[in-house]
């Protein structure tokens, strides 16, 4: 056991985690030269296209150190994006140490801090690494000072490397072996294995990634899932060298995969503990804290025949992504679908794209909303995650919206622009600290504003230099209203949105104008209105198409023309009474972009 090292790499987006992991795999000979590809561990197409890591991946490598010993390195690659911070905390729970990778040109960013604090809370040994020293803009001295100043780790002897060229990577491995402690645990005690991650394989059933904390697991053992009490046979187990390799035994301290032919998706929940059926452990391991989704949206299949397939797909995805929440919902406009909860907008996009790609579904998404806390006049507390669930106005005593605490790190010259943006988003400044040329800003901003487009706007006002980390702080009373959209005097539930009263007029008008462009013209006038309760705040009309019925009349009596025009008018009137308006998919997406272009 003293030759095992479990570690993960934490860093901000684009600071070179995945490239560094490629080099480590190459040096340890995990894959032959022919199989080596850039970003080996980003195995999803989506990850490669967007250049981001979404899922944590694990690899077991053998490293021949300079002291003549061979060490087993279990290494878990983690995502850097704020929406996937849950993946990071799960990966860290399986490790004893972490490499903190910082770009020597960009310096410390908000995400680096957030993930680093997570690691420190779990008492992991953090080893700082300065990456990208081959860049002309690199300034390792300044960045080393920044790490000490902002993060509070001694970085004077931080390893300097360039993951792209491979300079300094062997030093990192030596440092790992030296500084990161070997796993603790009792190899002879009863088995306790933590499920770090699981995914669904069409041939094998549920595959789980596990970390053995105590005891050992052999092929053919009967294992018991502690939370459900179900027992399964350990059919196959082994390690990743990124490829799956079968082994007969996983011993204490190792990280590996396990297949028990579990067909039920909820059979082995992430964060659960496995133990042996014949000699069970007394108590389960402390799992992970459950994360609460911050953003909710309705997802509906375009054709109702896909509903079953959609439900199965969501089940399989939620197994792989424990932070996804879903429950069935029906809408008068869109039929049956699911209300899904996500950690952020990027998370929502990724899930939607994965559903469309991996499961061939066509989906409509409603506008994302956050969770509001409503105190009714009967003094009950209700949590509302969709505008259609909001009680009637006269039953609401007060409406509280979630407030997010946002930590931003940015260069001084962009401070003015960013503060202006925060004020526009109804933010309250709580703290501001200068670190050299960097400023650390803390604001309390309503979650609804953060979720909508705050991250994109922050990046564009600061030319990409500002970085953001946010978490839910509390609910706070606020003057929020529900804006309904009426089309031909009928409310469309899927188009409703909850917004602050100050912005309601503006957002209502904007939405109505956008709808007018998107709804195709019909044979009759279509009135589009935005309303708060019964009070109409904006209206526009999609003009009817009309045929020129007088084309065949030449001169002659005017009463003939009047008769034809009157006949047309009556026809239109009758049509309007029975006519339905088909809403295109773009109309639902328009809500997402309300208020983006005009500001």
From Swiss-Prot:
Enzyme Commission numbers on file: 3.6.5.n1
Binding site for GTP: 14-19, 131-134
Broad class of where this protein is predominantly found: membrane
Transmembrane segments: none
SUPFAM superfamilies registered for this protein in UniProt: EF-G C-terminal domain-like, P-loop containing nucleoside triphosphate hydrolases
Matches recorded under InterPro entries: EF-4, EFG_III/V, EFG_V-like, EFTu-like_2, G_TR_CS, LepA_C_sf, LepA_CTD, LepA_IV
Keyword Cell division on entry: no
Membrane topology qualifier: Peripheral membrane protein
GO terms for cellular component: plasma membrane
UniProt subcellular location: Cell inner membrane
Record's keyword terms, sorted: Cell inner membrane, Cell membrane, GTP-binding, Hydrolase, Membrane, Nucleotide-binding, Protein biosynthesis
UniProt keyword Cell membrane, yes or no: yes
PROSITE patterns: G_TR_1, G_TR_2
Any one of the GO BP annotations: positive regulation of translation
GO molecular function: GTP binding; GTPase activity; guanosine tetraphosphate binding; ribosome binding; translation elongation factor activity
Coiled-coil positions: none
Superkingdom of origin: Bacteria
tr-type G domain segment(s): 2-184
Catalytic reaction(s) noted: GTP + H2O = GDP + phosphate + H(+)
Protein's job: Required for accurate and efficient protein synthesis under certain stress conditions. May act as a fidelity factor of the translation reaction, by catalyzing a one-codon backward translocation of tRNAs on improperly translocated ribosomes. Back-translocation proceeds from a post-translocation (POST) complex to a pre-translocation (PRE) complex, thus giving elongation factor G a second chance to translocate the tRNAs correctly. Binds to ribosomes in a GTP-dependent manner.
Family stated for the protein in its record: Belongs to the TRAFAC class translation factor GTPase superfamily. Classic translation factor GTPase family. LepA subfamily.
Name this protein carries in UniProt: Elongation factor 4
Organism: Yersinia enterocolitica serotype O:8 / biotype 1B (strain NCTC 13174 / 8081)
Gene: lepA
